[in-house]
């Protein structure tokens, strides 16, 4: 057959081709020059797909579709596509409190009380001194959505602090986060100025930027130093004698200076020596093992009673007191937390309240040890050593002002009873929250 160009076409019979050891039939159409029959001018293979190739294409399409669906799911669950959480928006009738240091001894007890009183609580803690076990206990007690959230963060990180405040709608801040050992502060003063003074400044700045209007600041009687006159009132001159007290006073000064031109409601609570634990047995004091030497006298008594240490070391027997040992005002943690909640309830815009939180009664270290022996039922061995640097002889409060203004008074004032409550938790949790 000829066409106008003098080229003829010829259809050849299908020929087998081998691909990977398999033969398939591929019909082929060739074009010849009729002047030169042996010359192939062109060829066109006809469409033909191996069944396995079709299956591979289908599989790829399904894979692409699956990945597309997965991407849609991930995007839809991202923060920009989900509805705001309860913590990120204000709700009428609900007060959202940021509790810094809320995994610590006092902070966790405060969080428990706030949650029990139907506050919404966000705990921020870097766990350098706090216990994740305390947070888990609170989460188990209050599992409902929108009640409690925990954020692992360091207040010394300004980006983290800004993120926390920008993503949450706080109504108030209870600022407990700090390092709080007098002896340690004399060894590592810069750590104390950073963690107490500098971090408080960061929190205060974030509150100002995000218009959080209430601050309850956890301060200390250590800001008074060693006053010449007892008891200590809120007007007693503040002359701290160790870096812990100095760092706290500097933080107080910053807050007071800021409040002069702010509508923020501020409460500063200067409290004394904290003991005890939750009467319900849910929380307790559990310092890290490496910090036990720096810890409170109650912790040392309990360690001695359990045989974790050979005995109790009392540092200083030559103070100008009745028995030569330091005199302190021991406040039960349950009473202390109650004072914080009352301060939160009574805080007023453009006003500052400063209060001592104590029982108004001083007890010597020797008295404390005897009470601890009775509470534990163990005859604790006591070694008397030289004074600890930075300590002071006698400190106890005059709680008249807090009674008058906030209608607060200490209820758990029996030293032995408070120690018995704490001892019950210690016996069940000999290794702290790791005992679960």
From Swiss-Prot:
Cellular compartments annotated: Golgi apparatus, Golgi stack membrane
Pathway annotation: Nucleotide-sugar biosynthesis; UDP-L-arabinose biosynthesis; UDP-L-arabinose from UDP-alpha-D-xylose: step 1/1; Cell wall biogenesis; cell wall polysaccharide biosynthesis
Membrane spanning residue stretches: 61-81
Region described as Disordered: spans on this chain: 1-20
Record membrane topology: Single-pass type II membrane protein
Keywords: Carbohydrate metabolism, Golgi apparatus, Isomerase, Membrane, NAD, Signal-anchor, Transmembrane, Transmembrane helix
EC number: 5.1.3.5
Protein name: Putative UDP-arabinose 4-epimerase 4
Species lineage: Eukaryota, Viridiplantae, Streptophyta, Embryophyta, Tracheophyta
């Amino acid at each position: 057959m000829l066409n106008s160009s003098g080229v003829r076409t010829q259809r050849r019979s299908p020929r087998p081709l081998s691909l990977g050891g398999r033969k398939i039939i591929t019909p082929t159409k060739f074009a010849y020059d009729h002047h030169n029959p042996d010359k192939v001018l062109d060829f066109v293979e006809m469409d033909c797909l191996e069944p396995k190739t079709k299956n591979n294409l289908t599989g790829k399409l399904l894979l692409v579709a699956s990945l597309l669906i997965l991407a849609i799911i991930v995007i839809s669950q991202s923060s920009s596509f989900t509805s705001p959480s309860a913590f990120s928006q204000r709700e009428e009738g609900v007060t959202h409190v940021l509790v810094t240091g809320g995994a610590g001894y006092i902070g966790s007890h405060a969080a428990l009380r706030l949650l029990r009183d139907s506050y919404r609580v966000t705990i921020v803690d870097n766990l350098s001194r706090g216990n994740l076990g305390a947070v888990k206990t609170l989460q188990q007690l209050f599992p409902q959505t929108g009640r409690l959230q925990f954020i692992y963060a360091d207040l010394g990180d300004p980006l983290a602090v800004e993120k926390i405040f920008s993503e949450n709608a706080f109504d108030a801040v209870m600022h407990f986060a700090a390092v709080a050992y007098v002896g340690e502060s004399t060894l590592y003063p810069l750590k104390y100025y950073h963690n107490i003074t500098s971090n408080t400044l960061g929190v205060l700045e974030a509150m100002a930027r995000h218009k959080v209007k209430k601050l309850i600041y956890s301060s200390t009687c250590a800001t008074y130093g060693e006053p010449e006159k007892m008891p200590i009132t809120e007007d007693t001159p503040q002359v701290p004698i160790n870096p812990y007290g100095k760092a706290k006073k500097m933080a107080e000064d910053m807050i007071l200076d800021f409040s002069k031109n702010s509508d923020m409601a501020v409460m500063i609570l200067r409290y004394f020596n904290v003991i005890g634990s939750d009467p319900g047995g849910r929380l307790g004091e559990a310092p890290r093992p490496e910090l036990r030497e720096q810890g409170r006298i109650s912790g040392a008594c309990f360690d001695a009673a359990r045989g974790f240490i050979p005995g109790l070391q009392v540092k200083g027997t030559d103070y100008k007191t009745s028995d030569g040992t330091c005199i302190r005002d021991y406040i039960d943690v349950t009473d202390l937390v109650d004072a914080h909640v009352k301060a939160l309830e009574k805080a007023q815009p453009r006003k500052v309240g400063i209060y001592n939180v104590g029982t108004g009664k001083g007890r010597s270290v020797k008295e404390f040890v005897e009470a601890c022996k009775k509470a534990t039922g163990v005859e604790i061995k006591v070694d008397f050593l030289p004074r600890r640097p930075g300590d002071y002889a006698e400190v106890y409060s005059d709680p008249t002002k807090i009674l008058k203004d906030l209608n607060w008074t200490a209820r758990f004032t029996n030293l032995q009873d408070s120690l018995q409550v704490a001892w019950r938790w210690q016996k069940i949790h000999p290794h702290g929250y790791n005992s679960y």
